[in-house]
């Protein structure tokens, strides 16, 4: 599920980055400047970052070729998150990838008055974080994927698909 979320985030990022290039006809000469803010070192968050970058690479955007990455980890400190996000915003990066809710909130707040797109992943409730309106539509310059596990809906689907199942397990 985390890898799928990271992959979907990368696809969204790719579509945003296409619009971030210069006005040149040859977009292959563009080098994108990407800032990545990760809230903490954690296996699932690390996988989100790796999946995001792998998704970009599958679309031809690769570090060292046409992508410059500035990666920062706030070590679970929201004040550090805010500083990183402000720094990224002042550098006018092409895009910010924010991993986990606190990092996404910091990036969103730092870029509200700019056109820097923010793509988040590992955000449990985009609505509660203020990234979508009451209809579920993105607000401002931010989009991404949620890591919310809807176990009740998953179990309902399993029951529909396998009504005779007696033992069901969900890996998370």
Identify the role of each PLM range.
Residues 1:
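Glycine-rich phosphate/adenylate-binding loop
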Residues 4-8, 21-172:
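Short hydrophobic alpha-helices and adjacent helix-cap/hinge residues
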Residues 15-19:
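C-terminal motif of bacterial Sec signal peptides marking the signal peptidase cleavage site
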Residues 9-14:
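Core hydrophobic alpha-helical transmembrane segments of single-pass membrane proteins
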């Amino acid at each position: 599920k985390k890898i799928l979320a990271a992959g979907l985030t990368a696809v969204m990022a790719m579509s945003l980055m296409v619009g971030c290039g210069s006005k040149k006809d040859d977009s292959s000469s563009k080098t994108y400047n990407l800032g990545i803010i990760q809230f903490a070192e954690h296996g699932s968050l690390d996988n989100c970052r790796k999946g995001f970058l792998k998704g970009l690479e599958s679309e031809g955007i690769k570090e060292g070729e046409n992508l410059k990455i500035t990666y920062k980890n706030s070590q679970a400190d929201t004040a550090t998150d805010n500083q990183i996000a402000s720094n990224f915003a002042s550098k006018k990066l092409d895009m910010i990838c924010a991993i986990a809710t606190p990092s996404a909130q910091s990036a969103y707040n730092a870029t509200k008055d700019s056109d820097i797109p923010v793509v988040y992943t590992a955000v449990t409730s985009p609505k509660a974080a203020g990234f979508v309106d009451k209809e579920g539509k993105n607000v401002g310059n931010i989009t991404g994927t949620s890591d919310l596990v809807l176990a009740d809906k998953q179990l309902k689907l399993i029951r529909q698909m396998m009504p005779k199942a007696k033992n069901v397990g969900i890996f998370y």
